[in-house]
């Protein structure tokens, strides 16, 4: 198939020194691109991999925890206007990613007229360039990613919570169970298998997130100053900025195998959960 041919060609290029200077006269160099990416600290790949793993872990932990407690709030019978809240909640998720990122870059994070800096100035503080250094840029990207991704996770958890039989909670209350006890022993075990596919899918999406990091910090002609790199932006930069196609292809193959390994482990985990 076309995909197999494309992947095979990428694998072949990863074993060559194809770049801007060796476009038509590239040579076979074996696993040199792989060793450069994985074994040489100055290649930048290991740093990008660490950033990607940190990015994925923090985003998913915060996303699931925050979504869980917001979804619990939606389960309150005395909460009025649930449909209105849920409808409003879908806007960040339904809005095109490019539009959301542009709005946040210009309307929220901009040094001169962004909302955050207007608030800081009003409070008597100086202006801050949120995208100029790596740590603030990382946190800014993560905040935007959470804003875009939380609605989906909230809706999935809300649906899972709605499917739990209320009689379990009534029995637990008769036994004197409190809020945390009910959540730990009833809610979480009951919804774990239901939301697992959504968590896995969102983890994949977060792991390979490109748009947010690129458009906030690295868009051509508008570099913010931060040198934040994930493995996806690292591969893109080597291919289309440095024109080092051999290394970029090797990184793409490494990413492919990382995703394959993660898929195998998550599928095994989901199967074991279903059998239990």
Question: What spans do the regions from the language model cover?
Answer:
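A structural signal for multi-pass alpha-helical bundles of membrane permease subunits
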Residues: 1-276
């Amino acid at each position: 198939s076309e995909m197999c041919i494309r992947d095979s060609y990428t694998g072949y290029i990863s074993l060559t020194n194809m770049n801007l200077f060796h476009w038509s006269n590239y040579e076979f160099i074996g696993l040199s691109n792989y060793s450069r990416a994985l074994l040489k600290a100055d290649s930048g790949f290991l740093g990008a991999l660490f950033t990607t793993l940190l990015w994925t872990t923090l985003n998913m932990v915060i996303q699931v925890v925050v979504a869980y407690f917001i979804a619990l709030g939606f389960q309150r019978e005395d909460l009025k206007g649930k449909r209105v809240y849920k409808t409003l909640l879908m806007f960040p998720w339904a809005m095109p990613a490019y539009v959301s990122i542009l709005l946040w870059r210009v309307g929220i994070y901009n040094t001169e007229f962004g909302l955050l800096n207007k608030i800081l100035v009003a409070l008597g503080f100086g202006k801050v360039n949120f995208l100029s250094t790596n740590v603030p840029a990382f946190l800014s990207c993560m905040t935007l990613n959470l804003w875009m991704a939380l609605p989906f996770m909230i809706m999935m958890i809300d649906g899972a919570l709605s499917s739990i039989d209320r009689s379990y909670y009534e029995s637990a209350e008769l036994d004197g169970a409190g809020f945390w006890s009910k959540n730990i022993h009833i809610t979480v075990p009951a919804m774990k298998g239901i939301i697992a596919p959504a968590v896995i899918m969102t983890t994949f999406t977060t792991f390979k997130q490109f748009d947010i990091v690129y458009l906030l910090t690295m868009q051509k002609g508008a570099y913010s100053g931060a040198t934040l790199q994930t493995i996806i932006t690292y591969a893109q930069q080597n291919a289309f900025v440095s024109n080092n196609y051999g290394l970029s292809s090797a990184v793409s193959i490494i990413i492919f195998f990382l995703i394959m390994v993660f898929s195998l482990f998550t599928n095994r985990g989901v199967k074991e959960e279903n059998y239990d």
